[in-house]
Amino acid sequence: NNQNFTNGKAKDFIKSDEKKLIKYENLGIILNNNDLSLHQLLKEKGMVFECCLLYKEHKNILINNFQKKICEDVKNNDPNVVSVNNFHDIYKWLKDKNIKNLILPYETVGNKVFHESNFLKTITNLEVKYTFYLREWDGNAFQYATKGFFNFKKNISTLLNQANIKNKI
């Protein structure tokens, strides 16, 4: 049953269920700026996986320096995270680690890195099944993020209640 892995367009607003992912062997996760902590969530669930972090330089030197420090922090906190710099590095990592099932961070509009047809076609040709992982928080928040920040802002308390986060003040 591969219903959690889709080789095609990421399904809109279908929340991922890590319980279904636990049973997959040869599991890999790719981190990037869209989600730098997904591996921690899955590690807490006791899942066994390989992990790499895609770092792409930004044109703005301040943003680039900031992103470099964050990526260094991720790698320092988990020495099992492998750095990759481009899609070819990812393909090599997939082959070297014998990854057959791949988790990618869910990508929002304007933030697409992996939802690129040549990349997806190549990993499919490598016989790797993939899924774009949508965190529950993001799935709940997307419905309020359609009309600008102020619509989102007025619904923050609703989101906090859904996440069972209470104001401690």
What is the predicted role of each segment?
Residues N2-I169:
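Trp/Phe/Arg-rich N-terminal binding region typifying the photolyase-homology
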